[in-house]
Amino acid sequence: MARVKEEADRISEQANSHIENIRRQIEQEKNDWAAEKQKLIEEAKAEGFEQGVALGKAEAMKQYAELIGQANSITEMSRKAVEDKLEDANEEIVELAVALAKKVWQQKSDDKEAFLLLVQQVINEVKEYDDISIYVDPYYYETIFQQKDEIQQLLYKECRLGIYADEKAQKGTCYIETPFGRVDASVDTQLMQLKDKLLTALEAGAAE
């Protein structure tokens, strides 16, 4: 467990460092864009003054308005670029979080209690069905089978429960057959669902 924690801390530090670098880069670009906008405004003022002397105030104001419009366009493009960069950063953060979860799981792959907990969480999604068959890879089969009574208590009272070993399945594989289809409780599938949930949460936050 100590080794797992050290690895998790290391990956977490990498993620935090990566996020901080992105934040610094975005802040620098915002400052650069602000300076560029101010420069354009100053140029517009200067050109407006010179044009006012040579061509008259009306023409000068037109030139001034055009340059101000350019400055505003740069500001809008800057804002959009910052939003895009933050969105990319959020996706990278999600990838790092999922990679961390997978790394920790791989180092705990012999932890049968952790796998049992994962399976039980998925069983909660199908506990109202009246016929359930659980298929597990050979490594974890005995662990799941020994907990059959405990699993049965999670289910609908009259539910028929079967637990089977899938000899061809890779380690960490588990799927549940129900009258309404299959539910995949495998580790990789759960990690992908975690990723989808994190991305959905980020998108919802951005929409707000």
Curated annotation (Swiss-Prot):
Membrane-spanning segments: none
GO CC list: cytosol
Domain of life: Bacteria
GO biological process, one term: bacterial-type flagellum assembly
Keyword GTP-binding applies: no
UniProt KW keywords: Bacterial flagellum biogenesis, Bacterial flagellum protein export, Protein transport, Transport
Family: Belongs to the FliH family.
Functional note: Needed for flagellar regrowth and assembly.
Name under which the protein is recorded: Probable flagellar assembly protein FliH
Name of the coding gene: fliH
